[in-house]
Amino acid sequence: MGTRSTSVSDAVAVLDERSREIFRRIVEGYLESGEPLGSRNLSRLLPMSLSPASVRNVMSDLEELGLIYSPHISAGRLPTQIGLRFFVDAFMQVGDLSAEDRANIDRQVRAESGGNPVESMMNEASRMLSGISRGAGLVITSKSDPVLKHVEFIRLEPTKALAVLVGDHDQVENRIIELPAGVTSSQLTEAANFLNAHMSGQTLPELRKQLSQLKDDVRHELDALSRDLVERGIAVWAGSPDEGKPAQLIIRGRANLLEGLGGAEDLDRLRMLFDDLEKKDSLIEILSLAESGSGVRIFIGSENKLFSLSGSSLIVAPYRDDDDRIVGAVGVIGPTRLNYSRIVPMVDYTAQLVSRLSRNPL
């Protein structure tokens, strides 16, 4: 008899107490060992008295619902992807972290403070998440555009000037630009004043968009050389080395994913996962997944098209900047038999900690 797909609400309505208990034991056994559980072992584990034959009947019902399957003839049962989702949504209990767990995470994430404190913090967060899971810990840092505060053009020589851009947190970017032939010092000042009048509270992409919408105002307020200077200044910042790099991936614990591989097929899936992680579009996709809901998101197997071929699970949560904007994500990628109830609260707390520390670096 073929299986039929089921939803969490369908399964909750259909399953009685013993069915739920048998299903829960099968999933917990899989998450702990990766091995299928048979009816004889299950009958010994259950709190109620059931014969192996009765257990097999329940397992048959669970298999028809699409919650479990048999990997081999006459073998025990393993949860399907639908079954894992049902378990996570209906059975998994996620408690608060203990004070000791929080202190350990704090200590590990803050472990390195030399050099670049923020980069060190991100590396430690990724390493720590890898250490608490059977997967790889990841941190995605997005290239956030600073809110603009001030711009100035400083002539260096007749044909070159230094364009100085100051952000709202006093970060400074300098670029050398080629000057239009014949530009005067007053035109440098005029171009800077025009940009300063329009940039308040905006990022560079926002300013660029606004100026394209104010072409008539630019034409009326500035002469041709000053307009050229404004366009060159914006163009040189837009052409910075970070342009086109919306995110950076920090990943630790890849070796964890090599453990327990079942053969060439598993190795191929792992290779596909690593290939996916190297793609820029993948980082954008993970960030969008983190942004698509509040708190921690759990994606199991093909629920996430990004990792559907490798059959991996992703547990991810966003972190935010001073303005409560999502600027990155932390999480764990690994096999579907991750310890979800243990990892979810740790990913959640780590995201909160990274949010706090990225606002106030070590």
Curated annotation (Swiss-Prot):
Pfam family, one: HrcA
GO molecular-function terms, A-Z: DNA binding
Keywords attached to this entry: Repressor, Stress response, Transcription, Transcription regulation
GO biological process: negative regulation of DNA-templated transcription
InterPro entries: GAF-like_dom_sf, HrcA, HrcA_C, WH-like_DNA-bd_sf, WH_DNA-bd_sf, WHTH_transcript_rep_HrcA_IDD
Function: Negative regulator of class I heat shock genes (grpE-dnaK-dnaJ and groELS operons). Prevents heat-shock induction of these operons.
Family label: Belongs to the HrcA family.
The name this protein goes by in its record: Heat-inducible transcription repressor HrcA
Species, as recorded: Rhizobium etli (strain CIAT 652)
Gene: hrcA
